[in-house]
Amino acid sequence: MNKNLTEIVFLLDRSGSMSGLESDTIGGFNAMIEKQKKAPGEALVSTILFDNVSEVIHDRVNIRDIKPMTDREYCVRGCTALLDAIGGAIHHIGNVHKYAREEDVPAHTLFVITTDGMENASRRYDSARVKQMIEHEKSKYGWEFLFLGANIDAVETAKHFGISEDRAVNYHSDSVGTRLNYEVVSCAITSMRSGAPMSADWKAPIEADYKTRKGEKD
């Protein structure tokens, strides 16, 4: 196992409900990647954009070779096949690790799942299957999963998928909330790449913003 290597998998919602947040999503993602390029250690990045279908724009690319995402890749459309995106990504990464040489298997694997709506279009995977897959990878290999959700109960949704409450957070699906997500996720990635356990308060800035502005909107 390569203790200096981290596997990072981003699953980003680009369904029609993300309309208007394209530039914030692209800008936040690119800023996070640039920051991570300067962090110590090696990292492989996979990025899956999902709507009705999943599109892989990075497949285990060295983080230092990632080019900025543009609106050619991130263009919103369609519905939300969230379960298919998660299930397909776990299956792919799991197979790669299974057949890799021991010294090539990353010591740390992190999935970051961001969505602003309910699952409504998956055909290959259901929540029971995805939950089984996530729980297997967590218990056997120590994979981490972060779930960031807007316009849904993110904590309850994550539970259905086998992701614990302390790894799920609600956020505001707007410019401020979207950019804050990437800042906070970047800090969590830095911690994981250093070999430190995921902090219990990794999501505190997002929670604070959500609660403060939820009160204002209510």
Language model: regions and residue ranges:
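Acidic, low-complexity intrinsically disordered regions
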Residues: 1-218
